[in-house]
Amino acid sequence: MIQSFTRLSVADNSGAKEIMCIKILGGSHRRYARVGDVIVASVKKAIPNGKVKKGQVVKAVVVRTKKEIHRENGSLVRFDDNAAVILDAKKEPIGTRIFGPVSREVRYANFMKIVSLAPEVL
């Protein structure tokens, strides 16, 4: 569960290393974001010569959370970190590679480009 001021690692090669959630999109007073939700975030750590810079405000989709995900078949899935992929204005990923596994819920949220770039979908 991601809320305001939560820091997430970035799971792509856009140049950002860490982002901080500012707002969760999809509702007027939405408190938490889960896997597949789009958030507005600020870049807190970035590498030099990257596509995004420190302090830039970006949109991102959550791909991994420490909080477990309950599936309809009764299974639970949880990850070791909170991670997101930075998006452009067309809701396509800015980076060309995805690092680490992504959750299957990203596919249900219609982010097929992220699913196709991911090395593993859990």
Swiss-Prot record:
Parts forming coiled coils: none
Name the Gene Ontology molecular function terms of this record: large ribosomal subunit rRNA binding; structural constituent of ribosome
Question: Pfam families of this UniProt entry?
Answer: Ribosomal_L14
The domain of life is Bacteria
Keywords (alphabetical) are: Ribonucleoprotein, Ribosomal protein, RNA-binding, rRNA-binding
- Decide whether keyword Ubl conjugation is in the record: no
- State the Gene Ontology BP annotations: translation
List GO terms (cellular component aspect): cytosolic large ribosomal subunit
Q: Does the keyword rRNA-binding apply?
A: yes
* Similarity comment: family membership: Belongs to the universal ribosomal protein uL14 family.
**How is this protein organized at the quaternary level?**
Part of the 50S ribosomal subunit. Forms a cluster with proteins L3 and L19. In the 70S ribosome, L14 and L19 interact and together make contacts with the 16S rRNA in bridges B5 and B8.
Describe the function of this protein.
Binds to 23S rRNA. Forms part of two intersubunit bridges in the 70S ribosome.
| Record-given protein name | Large ribosomal subunit protein uL14
- Native organism is Helicobacter hepaticus (strain ATCC 51449 / 3B1)
The lineage is: Bacteria, Pseudomonadati, Campylobacterota, Epsilonproteobacteria, Campylobacterales
